[in-house]
Amino acid sequence: MSAFIVLGSQWGDEGKGKMTDYLAKDVDVVVRFQGGNNAGHTVRVGDKEYKLHIIPSGILYKDKVNVIGNGVVLDPEALFQEIDYLEKAGVDIQPDNLMISDRAQLIMPYHKVLDGIKERSRGKKDIGTTGKGIGPCYTDKMERSGIRVCDLINQDVFKENLKENLKIKNDIITKVYGEEALDFDSICDQYIEYRKKLAPYVKDISVEVYNSIKNDKKVLFEGAQGTLLDIDYGTYPYVTSSSTIAGGVCIGAGIGPTLITGAIGVAKAYTTRVGKGPFPTELFDDTGDWIRKSGREYGVTTGRARRCGWLDLVILKTSSRVSGLTNFAITKIDTLGGLEKVKVCTGYKFNGKIIDYVPASLQDLAKCEPVYEEFDGWDKDIENAKTYDELPENAKIYLNKIEEFTNTKISIVSVGPGRDQTINLNNM
């Protein structure tokens, strides 16, 4: 595949960072196309662990070009903190291996303030935002009042846009919520400093990515979050503010759909979720606790404990359908090792019928009862398996069920967090 997508097929945290890192060795360009620093990707290389939030996972290879697309919302403060963190870890970052779209929207201090204020005002109806200003920034983008990277590069344009925006935002902050106004000069000075550091990285990434594909370079598009967090197909309103499915690539990276040759959906061998919202296969017993501890299920960005449950094949089937997945990469199958029995959800019982899709209505999804198929478990120690044949027979039966139900072949199986703990079935 010359231009392919790696995206999450559940509620995020599926292991996209590891999969992108693993696949990046064979590509030339890695592109982030949506989201912001609310994403959290963990990549382990040898005995080192890297936690990435905004920079594409390909940055850990010396010879890859990494691109932050126009569909991303960019917090310059978070970006430069991440660059500093990576450089201290020995990762070289220069304008020849990191590009930033001139059309990307900038997260401003008032976005983060409003994100926190609005979430607190919701009380018990909060939606679990990370408080990083992602939603308010996307709101400004759709209202056509946002400030883009290209606006920051033009200092006069930036000052004028900031002046207009801050007047409106301060009115909301002070008059609606009774909070303290933000200062124009301090924000302006801060972002003018960011401008100097950002400028060398800024390019028209649509042109760059298009030319890469046309020149037979291999391009990997790295998704953030997951299908069930998509603004349209997720469990709305407990979703993110961008399009996390394959269609988001065209908008967020500025290329046409005919240039994309494949889409790999990353999914855990079980299901997790952070924050509120329906979760049909959630486990509230000792098994759920065991999976959480065994899988180290705590958020990279928030540190919040993840809710855990059995694998939901209805969700994976939905993910495959809405993104046109060509392959699955299954992660953390080692976490289930040692359980005597494992289950997968093959349908929902809803209003006396069995359905195999995710309802749009939260109220309907909350009423859905999972229909399970039970399988025998497998040996705990599979972390050293190097080939598919070395996996326990019961694990293979489990994987075969995923392929059969979703009508999507599995191409990669992860048996641990390391690069070398990855089994490639060589069928992509």
From Swiss-Prot:
Keywords: Cytoplasm, GTP-binding, Ligase, Magnesium, Metal-binding, Nucleotide-binding, Purine biosynthesis. The gene is purA. Its main location: cytoplasm. This is Adenylosuccinate synthetase. Coiled coil: none annotated. The keyword Metal-binding applies. Homodimer. SMART domains: Adenylsucc_synt (SM00788). Its cofactor is Mg(2+). It comes from Clostridium kluyveri (strain ATCC 8527 / DSM 555 / NBRC 12016 / NCIMB 10680 / K1). Substrate binds at V300, T301, T302, G303, R304, A305, R306. GTP binds at residues 12-18, 40-42, 306, 332-334, 414-416. Mg(2+) binds at D13, G40. Belongs to the adenylosuccinate synthetase family. IMP binds at D13, E14, G15, K16, N38, A39, G40, H41, T130, R144, Q225, T240, R304. It is found in: Cytoplasm. One of its GO terms (molecular function) is adenylosuccinate synthase activity. It comes from the Bacteria. It catalyses: IMP + L-aspartate + GTP = N(6)-(1,2-dicarboxyethyl)-AMP + GDP + phosphate + 2 H(+). Pathway: Purine metabolism; AMP biosynthesis via de novo pathway; AMP from IMP: step 1/2. Its EC number is 6.3.4.4. Binds 1 Mg(2+) ion per subunit. PROSITE patterns: ADENYLOSUCCIN_SYN_1, ADENYLOSUCCIN_SYN_2.
